[in-house]
Every structure is written in C-alpha cells, then in structure tokens.
Swiss-Prot record:
The keyword Manganese applies. DNA ligase that catalyzes the formation of phosphodiester linkages between 5'-phosphoryl and 3'-hydroxyl groups in double-stranded DNA using NAD as a coenzyme and as the energy source for the reaction. It is essential for DNA replication and repair of damaged DNA. Coiled coil: none annotated. It catalyses: NAD(+) + (deoxyribonucleotide)n-3'-hydroxyl + 5'-phospho-(deoxyribonucleotide)m = (deoxyribonucleotide)n+m + AMP + beta-nicotinamide D-nucleotide. Transmembrane segments: none annotated. CDD domains: BRCT_DNA_ligase_like, LIGANc. This is DNA ligase. NAD(+) binds at residues 32-36, 81-82, 121, 144, 181, 297, 321. Belongs to the NAD-dependent DNA ligase family. LigA subfamily. Its EC number is 6.5.1.2.
Amino acid sequence: MTAAETRILELRAELDQHNYRYHVLDEPSIPDAEYDRLFRELKALEAEHPELVTSDSPTQRVGSAALSAFTQVRHEIPMLSLGNAFEEVDMREFDRRVNEGLDLPAGDLFGGGAAVEYSCEPKLDGLAVSLLYQDGVLVRGATRGDGTTGEDISVNVRTVRNIPLKLQGSGWPATLEVRGEVFMSKAGFERLNAAQLEAGGKTFANPRNAAAGSLRQLDSKITASRPLEFCCYGLGQVSADIADTHIGNLERLKQWGMPISRELRLAKGIDECLDYYREIGERRNALPYEIDGVVFKVNSIASQRELGFRAREPRWAIAHKFPAMEELTELLDVEFQVGRTGAVTPVARLQPVKVAGVTVSNATLHNMDEVARLGLMIGDTVIIRRAGDVIPQVVQVVTERRPENARPVQIPESCPVCGSHVERTQLVKRSKGRETVSEGAVYRCVGRLACGAQLKQAIIHFVSRRAMDIEGLGDKTIEQLVDENLIASPADLYRLKYEQIIDLEGFAEVSSNKLLKAIEDSKRPALARFIYALGIPDVGEETAKVLARSLGSLERVQQALPQVLTYLPDVGLEVAHEIHSFFEDSHNQEVIGSLLAADQCGLVLQDQGELGAEFAASTTLGGMLDKLNIPSVGPGAAQKLADKFGSLQGVIEADWLDMRQALPEKQAKAVREFFDNPANAQLAQAIEQQLQAFGMHWQSEKKVVAGLPLAGQTWVLTGSLELMSRDVAKDKLESLGAKVAGSVSAKTHCVVAGPGAGSKLAKANELGLKVLDEEAFVAFLTEHGVPT
C-alpha cells in the first residue's frame, strides 16, 4: 500500500469518527477549523489520486451531476404509515388493543391496564426515507413513496451530513435497512428562506416542505447545499436480528454511527406514555425542529411480531398527534357533495384564511351529525384547524359572534347533482354477534349510478392504477363520457366505439386507438384487482387481496355469509356486512354479470382457484365455535367442546351431562342456552355448511399447512419476471406453503432469479443455494399444479 493510500484511509477513518462524535454523540473533540483542515487534506489527496476515490468517502457528500428523473424502488418490506391518536381516550384504546392482542390482563378504559413497555420519541415533521447498507456501506437511499414503491434518491441522501456512508465499529448484519426521517431544523429553515429571499428564489412555507423539496432535487448539488438532517427511528429488512427490543435496536444503530432521537425514552404503561406526551407538548416550541406528535411503539420485538399488522399500519405502534394550528374565519356557506357510495356530505365554504402556512377556503364537516354537534349556522365565526396538519376542519363555533341573520344548515331533500331523493339511514354497529343502533346517521342519494356524481366517482375508481389500470381515462375524460351519456356503468366502458371517443375533447386518431387498446388490455384482471375496482364500501386494496387470496374465486366471495367473511384476516363484521350487502344488491349483480359475460364485456378473471391454504388450515371446529361469540365461552372452552364432541351437530345435540364433562357449569349452561335458540343453531349450521361447501373440513387443522410441498421453506424472488409480477409469484409460492423473504441467507431454500438479478443472486451462488430462472420456476409451479 502506498503512502497516499495509507494517509487517505487514515483521514477517512478520522473524519468518520469526528462526524460520529459531532452528529450522533454531540461531543465534538476537535474545533471546526481542524476538521476543515483534515477535510481539505483528504480532498487534495483524492484529487491527486482519483483512482482511490470511493463512494463512502466523506468528500462525496457535495453532490454530482443532475439527474433527468428518479428511478423507482420497491420496498421489500412495505414502509407503512402509523395509526393516529388525537385524544387521551384514543391512546387508552390503543393500549387496550395491545393488551388484548398480547392476551394480557387489562384494566378498565381509564385504569391503565397491564404495564406494557413502550418506546417514546417525538414525531419529526419531515420526509420518511429508507437507507440500505450492504456489509456496512450505504448502497441505496429511497423515499417512502406509497409505502410499497418509492424513488431512488441515493445520490441525494449521500449529501446529508449526519448519514454515515460507512457504518462505525463492527457486528452489523450483512444487509441492514435503516428507516428514519430527513428533516430541516427551525434554524436551518430560517437560514434557507433568508438565502432564498436574498437570491430572489422561492421561499418555503414550512420546514417539512423545505426538507421534502430539497431531498427530491434532481440536482444533488442543490440538496448538498441545504441544511438537511437525518434521524433514525427503525429498521426495514435485516439479514439477522439485532436486539430483543426496539430501543435496543436503536442503541446498536447509534453505536454504528446512526443518529437517533435524543428524546428517546422507555415508558412502562400507558400513563407514563401520556406523561411523556404532555412533557414533549410543553417543550414543543423550544425544540430545535418541528414535530407534529409523539410516536409510541411496543418495545418488545417479540410482542411486535405477535401483534402484527393491519392492512396499512402496524398494530404495535401509534402516533399521538398534537392539536394542529388553528385560526378564526367566517362560514360563508355550506354546500353538499355526493361521493362514490352516494353519501351526501356537507362542505364548509370559508372566508379564506391562512392556517399553518396554507390558505384555507374550504373545510370538511364530515356529516350532518358533526354539523349538529357543532351547532353550526351559516354566517358563524368558526375555528378552523388543519386536522393532522393536512385536512382543514371546522372544530368550534364562536357563538358569541353569531350574527342576527345566521341561517341553519339544512340537508337537501333531493340530490344536488341528479335530483333523486336523499334518504336518511340510521347507522348500525355490529360487534361480537350483536347489532346496536348508533346515534349517527348517513344521508344518501338513492340515484346510484343514475347520479352523475356517483357514476363519475365509481368510474374514476374502477379505472384507477391499482384497480383496472386503464391508461388514458383521466378524470376530465370520464366527466365527458358521463356528461355526454356515453356510459352509465363500468360495463359501458367496454362498449365504447372509436367514433364516440374521437369526438371527445382532447382526442385524435392515435389517442382514440390507444384508449381502446388500453380498455381491451384490461379484460384479464387479477381477481384482487377486480374486487377492488368494484368499489365495495370499506374494501380497500389490501382487503381485496385478502378476499382473493383466501377465497380463491369471485363466486365464493359473492356467496360468502358475513360470518364466514370474518374468518379472513383483518375483516371485521362491519366490513363483512358491507361486502355481503354489495353482492346481494340486484343492480350490482347485473353490472358484474355484464362485465363477465362472454357475449357482452368479456372480462376473464385471472388467479382464480382453490381456497387459500393458510385460510383453509386456520378454520377449525374450535375456532368456529369461538367465533359464534357464545357468552362466557372463549377460545379455550371452544376447543374443549371441539375435542369432546368432534362436530358441530354433536355440540348442538349434547345433553347436559355430556356438556358438564367438557365445561364448568356456568359455561355449559351458556352453551346450552345459546343452541336452544333455533336461530343460533341454524346460523351455526349455515356457516358450517358454507365452509364445507367451499372445501373446508374440520380435519384441516394447522397440520394441513405442514403437508404443503413447500411448508417450512424460505424462498427469495429477485430480478424482474416477464410472465408474471413478483407479487403474483409470491402469492403462488405462498399457496404451496412457502415463506417468501426479502433477503438471501444460509436458511434460504431456493432463489428465483429473473433478468437484472444482482446482489441476491450473487449471494445465493456464494452460499451454494438452489437457483431457478423464470422458465424453471414456471415448470416447477406447473409440476405442483399451480396455474401460471
């Protein structure tokens, strides 16, 4: 090694150590002038020896040539958003759910319950990013994006001073994805805006916008000039576990050079969490950065895994938001808009006012119950808040300023769009097998797809990227199609002719043919996409995937009883009833029939087949008895009944003596009384019959999964696949019992490598793992009876 190489390595190590002490420990050991001298020496040596410059050198933070666009990055583990709490009662409800999910004893709603340990830290108001390290070196930075797909901003994150280009120390996993927030301090924000003003450039409304705009610059030299900082708050994919607790993980990351929150704290129980929230709230204005709340996470990693996730958020974490900034203004009018499901909702038209740096002239009123709760009248002076710092909301009426000519807000008797009758429907709450009428009500236009507003929103949803994905059908085009009476339902899209399209504004020969081709190309949708496209109330993309993966066919989804639907992951009784009601509706049946009829629209659904293996294996007699919500009978007692009698009919017909052999007197009496009610017995039998008609049987206990050909195996997908998406490939592997992981390790059984496979394929070859190309993978699936 030459003297220059040796000195360059020494300088890099020394500068990395000083960066760590300055940005992470806040304990600088040399003056800034000495740091600058060392930095200049390294820069000069690298200029003399450009062949020795590496991407992890401290000198590489200055930015490089501008990009034309960012490339997309798929997150192997989705970057989910957090659920929100706005009041103390929301936090106590979260704590109750955590205790319930961990099967811990919980007190009453305000009693604190069991003392679960939570990590606490301020919720920085910035931009969420993912940093991927391979063997301790930063190889990629990405934005959160939609949680599944983000943008590759690697060249920009390298310019953020306190992000280590190379980890300190040793002992880190080979693959380590760090997640955190890039933000701008209040002081940095003020300096940036002052500089922008002086240069005649654009100023930013708030530090968050400044941070987001700076990080997404195509010219990384601009990013390098901005006062950005990073704070780590968690992990994504890792090739090996680090610690048993969330705080333990963060402490290890700090040792490796990652900046973590100086306000990080452990709280025992919900009351300590609330104390922390109040303390941070009192200090909020004094903190050097903007925050919009506090994040609480169950500290135990094992407990986090046990609690798992909802469709879009973890069950083990929550963001307790601070009250947003508020302003006074005048309510000029209340107008009514009609949504996709026909709900008629009020919208406040306001005297424009600035709230948190944004001019607000409209605000949500949610529903007429909210209008009544507020006691709102047109002409009132109201307090406007940006709820969650995003959606403007009317939160209070200043009644002492009410003018004499103030007018009450009245729901229209007929739809403001189509003139159809507006009906009031009382809301019904369903829980644990019981229905109760709630105080709330919803007003709906009964015009359905005859209502232009509902039809437009339904079509916009139907053609959207995550639904049928029909390119070229923008909102304005859909408005034209509806206004010109060219479509009256989603099925009419597939009946459009060239002559009709070319007459639309903005269309010519090429664009008309392109749209017709896009419509034709959408005729073979995956089952999950089709279900999502139908616009079933409360059924989002993730729930649609669960329905498709678990039930395997549209016919089963259409037939499923609400009680059977609750057997699916994350489908509660409310959503189950919405799904069931949607498919019971004769108009919806007609539209679906037209879409699927070969002599009409001719859609052919893909990925239909048998019941999902995990779903089939998860439904047992004991589980079914538990889900009947028999009073005093929990999972343990339900399993005792299943073990004793072996069939539902056996439980229903059991005499008192046999029942007492299985259960204590109180529980036995509850079971007997439950099934003595003919309606309960008939419902239980109907559920059993449907489950069995779907292909399930009580012998399909968990052990059935173990009988699947890939049970216990871990597979990895890498590169691009040409015959199917990676999501589809993942579903097919999971149907055979495999676990699909995001990283390669010695425990990986097989790697499926498509074109463009990189480090994962190299790692697989290094470890001597089995590797299949796409052709071999398709043959493997065919051999195991999985359609491709």
